Amino acid sequence: MQSKFIVIEGLDGAGKSTAISFVRKYLEKNNLAAIYTREPGGTKIAEELRNLVLHNKYDEEIHSDSELLMIYAGRVQHYRNLIAPALEKGINVVSDRFYWSSMAYQGGGRGVELSKIRALNDNFLNGCEPDLVIYLDIDPILGLQRAQKVGSPDRIEKAGLEFFNRTRKVFKDLVKDSDNAIEIDAAKSIQEVEKQIYLILDKHFNFQN
């Protein structure tokens, strides 16, 4: 069976970590080897860039374009050094976020032109597209409330409600325009979200469990 690149997307507080735990449980049950990773981050250099973007300790504003380029520098490291090699070896890759998050957060939220982001993906990631995107949709107010229970808000989580409304809109537009993305209502119970994820994976891997 050809390796798959599966990405979980969604706003902060949508429950991506929980969703990934369900994907892991499913793949392990079916004896499918996989690595689990995240963005921003995923490699040592990419994690350093993540810390700079999310927890800027310097008395210097990060411009929206700079934020995008720092995230993409980390994404190139992540893709070239971890994602692509694993897929070539026949290992499935499950990632908490990929380039859709840049389209939504830096594009929708920050207002960077989406064409610029697509160009980065085409030029530096060979136009890489996940085999499956599971988008967890949640109202930004509920998402931020959930995120605040986990810990102190990071630099992006402090961006404000309108930022997240714009971000959500781009996510939903991306799902509508994609043939390999499925939206799940993340406000539903954990049990219902788990059930839907298993059904999606059954269909994707052609399993009947």
From Swiss-Prot:
GO terms for biological process: dTDP biosynthetic process; dTTP biosynthetic process; dUDP biosynthetic process. Belongs to the thymidylate kinase family. This is Thymidylate kinase. InterPro entries: P-loop_NTPase, Thymidylate_kin-like_dom, Thymidylate_kin_CS, Thymidylate_kinase. HAMAP family: Thymidylate_kinase (MF_00165). GO terms for molecular function: ATP binding; dTMP kinase activity. The keyword Iron-sulfur does not apply. The lineage of its organism: Bacteria, Pseudomonadati, Pseudomonadota, Gammaproteobacteria, Thiotrichales. ATP binds at G10, L11, D12, G13, A14, G15, K16, S17. GO terms for cellular component: cytosol. Phosphorylation of dTMP to form dTDP in both de novo and salvage pathways of dTTP synthesis. Keywords: ATP-binding, Kinase, Nucleotide biosynthesis, Nucleotide-binding, Transferase. It catalyses: dTMP + ATP = dTDP + ADP. Its EC number is 2.7.4.9.
